[in-house]
Structure formats: C-alpha cells, structure tokens
C-alpha cells in the first residue's frame, strides 16, 4: 500500500483525562462498553464513507467527541454517512441480550447523537437536508430555531431531573455544553468543508 492510502488516527490529550476520570468513577466493564460504543459508531461512519468510495484522511478522537475528516463528499452522500453512525450503532441492539452494557451505552449515545443540534449527527443531517432549500437565510433561521428549541427543552428537563429526582447539578451540564458548542461552531447551511462526525 502506498503512502496515500494511510489514515491518520489522532487521540488528543483530553481523551486520556476522560478515560482516567471514568476509570476512577465507573466500573471498568462500563468504561469498556462506552468506548466500544464510540468505536463502533465511528466504524459505521467510516464504513459508509468507504462503501461510497470516499477516502478517509483522518480520524480524530477528542474529549468532546470524535471527528472523521474525509475527502469532500456530495451533500446526499454526506447525509448518508452522517446517519450511518447512529443507525449502524442501533443495530447492536439486536444483540442486547448478549451484550446488555454495550446496548445501554449504544442506546444513550445514539439518542444523544441524533439530537438535531450541530455538530451532533442529527444536526449535521438537518443541515444537509436543509441545504437543498433555495432560501439559505430561511434554512439557517430554521436550523437555529430547532437547535434553540431542543436545547431549551433539554435544559428544562435537566433542571427538573436535578431537583425532582435529586440528581444534583450534573444533568444541567449536558444542555449547557451543547449550547456552548453550537455557539462556537455556527456555520452557514452552504457547505464548504465536508466533514462527518
């Protein structure tokens, strides 16, 4: 194989901090299941890209998720490859009796990833679908409204869970994290850099 066929896999330092924290707080069987779910999810993204004939340039694991950088994709192919991660991961649920921990991790990860908030997979699919709209301003406004609605709903749910179920402040961090991430990464519907998360 030539130099051109290699894919760079990068693991950023924040990932090691997350792993160390999880090993201190969670049984190792759950940690292994969680990271297996992440790897499976990314493998389904990679498999769909390869099946559609695209070259994967880099796979980057970060503390806030993983990112696959590929050669530029057509919009429809980008939608298919983005949706392949959560949909493929959900196929693992067919084996839930044999792998209950992995199935729980896959279900939680897929549900979270399908939220229509960019840069999650659901938000990427929504952006891809709305990129077909003629009016880019209307598409961007619709995306912003959907994201704010979902994050607001999550925030109210997290606050209720925190007080009613006495879960502490931790559930509120998820919508706050999403809110910060969407504000930092706002991009127009017109795609110039084709990436699949």
Where are these regions (language model features)?
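Hydrophobic transmembrane alpha-helices and their immediate loop junctions
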Residues: 1-197
């Amino acid at each position: 194989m030539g130099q051109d066929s290699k894919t760079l896999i990068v693991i950023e330092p924040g990932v090691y901090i997350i792993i160390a924290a999880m090993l201190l707080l969670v049984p190792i069987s759950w940690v292994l299941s969680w990271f297996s779910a992440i790897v499976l999810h990314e493998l389904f993204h990679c498999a769909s890209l390869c099946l559609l004939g695209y070259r994967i340039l880099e796979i980057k694991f970060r503390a806030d998720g993983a990112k696959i950088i590929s050669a530029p994709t057509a919009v429809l192919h980008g939608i298919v490859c983005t949706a392949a991660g959560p949909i493929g991961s959900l196929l693992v649920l067919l084996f839930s009796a044999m792998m209950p921990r992995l199935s729980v991790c896959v279900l939680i990860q897929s549900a979270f990833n399908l939220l229509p908030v960019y840069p999650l997979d659901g938000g990427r699919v929504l952006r891809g679908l709305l990129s077909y709209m003629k009016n880019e301003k209307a598409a961007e406004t619709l995306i912003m409204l959907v994201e704010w609605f979902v994050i607001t709903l999550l925030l109210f749910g997290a606050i209720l869970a925190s007080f009613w179920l006495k879960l502490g402040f931790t559930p509120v961090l998820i919508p706050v994290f999403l809110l910060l991430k969407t504000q930092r990464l706002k991009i127009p519907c017109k795609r110039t850099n084709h990436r699949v998360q």
